Amino acid sequence: MARGDKVHINLVVIGHVDSGKSTTTGHLIYKCGGIDKRVIEKFEKESAEQGKGSFKYAWVLDKLKAERERGITIDISLWKFETAKYHFTIIDAPGHRDFIKNMITGTSQADVAILMIASPQGEFEAGISKDGQTREHALLAFTLGVKQMIVCLNKMDEKTVNFSEERYQEIKKELSDYLKKVGYKPDTIPFIPISGFNGDNMLERSTNAPWYKGPILVEALDALEPPKRPVDKPLRLPLQDVYKIGGIGTVPVGRVETGVIKPGMSIQFAPNKVIAECKSVEMHHEQLPEAVPGDNVGFNIKGVSVKDIRRGNVASDAKNDPAKEAATFYSQVIIMNHPGQIQAGYTPVLDCHTAHIACKFETIHDKIDRRTGKSQEENPKFIKNGDAALVTLIPTKALCVEVFQEYPPLGRYAVRDMKQTVAVGVIKKVEKKDK
């Protein structure tokens, strides 16, 4: 398909474990996607042989996940599907244990989130409880600037639910109240009763829920606002990997977050100030005259060794607001998952775009109200779970970050400690290291 045909939208699927994310996603890809029929037949046969019939769609996704984890060559078209109006890419495999980290550093910004809810008694309640993932994922999506959301009330076919309008209304009300607290406007969000396994209200209107008059999933997807891509901003391209390719040379790989990259440009890398000329740009083994935000590309540079640049560095245009190393940065942080108290001096690892670097909480300036941003306490001694605060951080090693308002993907981060995401942050000011 030519690049110009349909607008491209990045989709993230969030929600509690076992809410049916994989089954529903698998079903969508299966019915509207680029999966080769032969591949599906092979998966179906294996699925039946292993007695996994009921997981047919999730099984498709599991096989894709396994292929994705084996190497970078997996055919990314497998994660795409099309509707009448848009071309969708699913940008993270739900259920992945690093899902929260991936959502933040994610190789891309999601334009829309599908929040998957399990409707059966007890399952919805577990997901929305204090330690359920529904709340955490919704809060994350909003904090990270995913403004559009579609809610799917899944497993409506389960016998305790049986497409009950009463159960639908009960869940819709409780979820609306929570989403409003987070910052979403529930009246702009479709709440769709579906069965991810049977396909009710996904691509065709179900006769099982005649009381439901809203959009079905495919209609809600087509009704999304097309995302604005920041083509006119200066280039920022965080490196995911750097390869040395015989006969070609050094090839950094990453996703264009803002601006454009094209052959002939003088590329400056931060934080290490290496400058090199971009010789060529390619995507899916095709040479491009230029790459724009959202494109995952490799580009060839001359005169720079693989040792000089690495994952976590940021490529920019040497002649247009080049990226620089950050000396300190000031940000709003939300503590989500920390067992104790966080005080000045705390030095966890930050995952920001593709960088993974320890940073010190130098000063905790204010504890603030998450929704209004107003100060609740100045210079608090410590902050704990559920708190939002304004803090100054100092990287322990060279790091390039940006202000969230200017370069969103380089201005949000996950705080990692004890193998989990303990906090998320959004950068408000950056003190750059000069020359």
UniProtKB/Swiss-Prot annotation:
**What ranges does the record give for the region G3, renumbered to this chain?**
92-95
Q: Which InterPro entries match?
A: EFTu-like_2 (IPR004161), G_TR_CS (IPR031157), GTP-eEF1A_C (IPR054696), P-loop_NTPase (IPR027417), T_Tr_GTP-bd_dom (IPR000795), TRAFAC_GTPase_members (IPR050100), Transl_B-barrel_sf (IPR009000), Transl_elong_EF1A/Init_IF2_C (IPR009001)
- What residues does GTP bind to? 15-22, 92-96, 154-157
This protein's UniProt keywords: Cytoplasm, Elongation factor, GTP-binding, Nucleotide-binding, Protein biosynthesis
Disulfide bridge map: none
Spell out the residue ranges making up region: G2.
71-75
Q: Which GO terms describe its molecular function?
A: GTP binding; GTPase activity; translation elongation factor activity
User: G5: where is this region?
Assistant: 195-197
**Role this protein plays:** This protein promotes the GTP-dependent binding of aminoacyl-tRNA to the A-site of ribosomes during protein biosynthesis.
Under which name does UniProt file this protein?
Elongation factor 1-alpha
